[in-house]
């Protein structure tokens, strides 16, 4: 739960929390004939200053050009939250069975997989958040 981790960092390491809300990190994904770039802080706040999105992916982080002090602040923050993300206390693990589906809020929850033996097929789909929120409001 990225929000639970962000709240812990906010309470126990307020300076690191501020850095993670302010310093933009670029991510890059290349595969399947596409290149996707995104640049945003790891912890993104809404206009009211409330946490809105947690974005963290050590594998797709791109080259960053930051001043030395900002780079050190960012690395301190990454080291802290990476340790928390990998702490079993903040994880829920579930082995999907054939035909099973899971729906999650990609702005709140981080997701991944552990090692497995054998072959598997996993299909993923993303719904645009604005479309989802709009539709939710229409059906409320």
What are these regions (language model features)?
Residues 1-140:
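Active-site environment of non-heme Fe oxygenases that use a 2-His-1-carboxylate facial triad
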């Amino acid at each position: 739960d990225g929000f639970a981790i962000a709240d812990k960092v906010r309470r126990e390491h307020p300076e690191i929390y501020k850095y993670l809300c302010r310093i933009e990190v670029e991510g890059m994904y290349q595969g399947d004939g596409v290149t996707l770039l995104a640049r945003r802080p790891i912890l993104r706040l809404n206009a009211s200053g409330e946490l809105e999105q947690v974005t963290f992916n050590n594998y797709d982080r791109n080259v960053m050009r930051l001043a030395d002090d900002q780079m050190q602040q960012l690395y301190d923050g990454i080291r802290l939250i990476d340790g928390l993300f990998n702490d079993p206390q903040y994880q829920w693990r579930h082995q999907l069975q054939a035909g099973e589906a899971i729906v999650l809020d990609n702005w709140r929850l981080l997701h991944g997989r552990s090692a497995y033996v054998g072959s598997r097929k996993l299909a993923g789909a993303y719904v645009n958040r604005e479309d989802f929120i709009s539709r939710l409001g229409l059906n409320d």
